[in-house]
Amino acid sequence: MSEYLVQFNNISKFFGKVIALKDVTMKLKRGEIMCLLGDNGAGKSTLIKTLAGVHKPDEGEIIFEDKKIIFDSPRDALDIGIGTVYQDLALVSLMSVTRNFFMGREPQKGLPLFKTFDIEKANKIAAERMGQIGIDVRDPSQAVGTMSGGERQCLAISRAIYFGAKVLAVSYTHLTLPTNREV
């Protein structure tokens, strides 16, 4: 087994005549933190979107847990454990912390034909998981729109980790996360 969780081998991505990525090679170990720095238009977001299954590379290969992978959709990336938190966070301001945390993957209770959303369990999990990364959510039914930008980004990160992200690509953390936050 390789020491690397993710490997990009000579990845290139083109949009018409625009070269977005050219021969990018990088390796990421389990537990490693990597920061991509570059000017606007340097390809950082394209690289993240390629890892997340939004874009298919035109050249090169992606190796994840020693297997060559080809994503047909972002769902494929999620299914193997690649989570992504984008700058816009994909949160709904008018919905609660709990609803945003589970969005489409709500815990259920009841009989097989009569299942309902287990709000008590969901509230408990959302509050606990947010607490684990230093965000005190006194009322998980509060609207996400009442939270700061950093708290919202922590919610999106916490959600990705809870649902099994082995790799977490986070775009523009410096815009909203406090510098003393540990995840």
Residue ranges of predicted features:
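Helix-to-loop junction immediately C-terminal to a conserved catalytic motif
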Residues: 52
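The feature captures the beta-strand-to-loop junction immediately N-terminal to the Walker
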Residues: 37-39
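Conserved ABC transporter NBD signature motif
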Residues: 60-70, 76-80
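Conserved ABC nucleotide-binding domain
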Residues: 129-145
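Conserved small/polar residues in nucleotide/adenosyl-binding loops
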Residues: 173-179
